[in-house]
Amino acid sequence: MVNVIKLRKGLNINLKGKAARQKFSSGKCAQYALVPDDFVGMTPKVVVREGDTVKVGDALFVNKKQTDVKFASPVSGVVSAVVRGDRRKVLRVVVDADKEQQYVDFGQKQVASLDGDAVVKALLDAGLFGYINQLPYAVSTTPDRKPRAIFVSALRDMPLAGDFEFELDGNERDFQTGLSALAKVAKTYLGIGAQQTNAALTGAKDVEVTVFDGACPAGNVGVQVNNIAPVNKGEVVWTVDPTAVIFFGRLFNTGKVDLRRLVAVAGSEINEPAYTEALVGQPISSLVESKLAKTEHVRLINGNPLTGRKCTAADFVGGHTSEITAIPEGDDVDEMLGWILPRTNDFSVSRSYFSWLFGKKKEYSLDARVKGGERHMIMSGEYDKVLPMDIYGEYLIKAIIAGDIDRMEQLGIYEVAPEDFALAEFVDSSKLELQHIVRQGLDMLRKENA
């Protein structure tokens, strides 16, 4: 019997520009780049030089602290640049792609005949292991500690997020192979949404399926971990993006690294929002250049509007990116009387505007403005209304700001990731950058416990 967990807290933000279940072609590109910052908590050591020839699956850089964790090139070709920033920080490794792609053959493997160590070794050798994250700290993991459990969330419910069921179509076999491989390492939990009906999800084998019924952020893997089996101090669990599970399955089924994924190009500033097949590291310009309604006063986001990163068309599809979104920047708006003027087209959690009368199906075109400056933190219970976790969000944020490590541990910082506070940041009257604050707290704890 499938376990069903109903979440009463949360908030759905219905934005204009959801991607239709249609595909468009973004074509092949001359250059691709792998960006180390996509793999949080990992310090890269570049293992190629400009002019080197690489195949798909060859390592471009490794984790400096654990060099057996490699990061594979998404394309074959010639390394054209290793771009560095301040203090020689590696920003990206750029590869000029071949017209005909060549692959490293890692050999097909029958997952049923492998044990957990063999699965981990295969992922390490192919440069895919770094796509696995961990709690605590919400960073790219390393193989030196065996996880207590592995969690996969197939529910993407952030505003304008890509529909994983649409991406799963045609990849069911690889997805199941990836799940079976992870189950060899540790007990694996698959979280799905109450509205998801794909048999590859509802009938997934070798894993424990849990249905989450509730508003955003029910799809956050951290929320699911907290509601299924919370993380205690000293424990480690792995969290895996469902697309990465497909990557793993392709490796075992074909013996090759294949980083193709379906990316939603969405937002109110996109003409005919839809999906396109793209590679990790593909230039964002190839996805949006024919889709942008205008080129000025637009905020491009590598990810969704709540947890994604501000980017430009010259940036590249991230390692965990399932959508590229475009919303109004808001820097050309001049509103008479500001928020005081009654209106019907603005979203309000507190029902300050009359837009709530139009029901939950009304779509909004929100821009990137914060609409207010940072101010003193008010203990109002705002966070708890949109945070379906067994933690005291406001008290945890205060402990992080104060740098009180003991208090942070007591309040459950080991269970959270920055994205878990995305909605709290959206509704916060104090205009605090909560995700950034949580990231600072996690980095502080990680350094303290190193």
Which residues make up each language-model segment?
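Mobile cofactor-carrier "swinging-arm" domains
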Residues: 1-15, 22-23, 80, 85, ...
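Short, solvent-exposed loop/turn positions at domain surfaces
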Residues: 42, 48, 65-68, 272
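Exposed loop/turn and edge beta-strand positions of beta-sandwich/beta-sheet ligand-binding modules
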Residues: 42, 73, 89
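Short coil-to-beta-strand transition motifs
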Residues: 68-76
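N-terminal, Lys/Arg-enriched amphipathic/low-complexity engagement segments
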Residues: 1-47, 62, 212
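Buried, small/hydrophobic-residue-enriched core segments of structured protein domains
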Residues: 69, 83-286, 290-450
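Short, well-structured beta-strand-loop connectors
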Residues: 48-62, 81
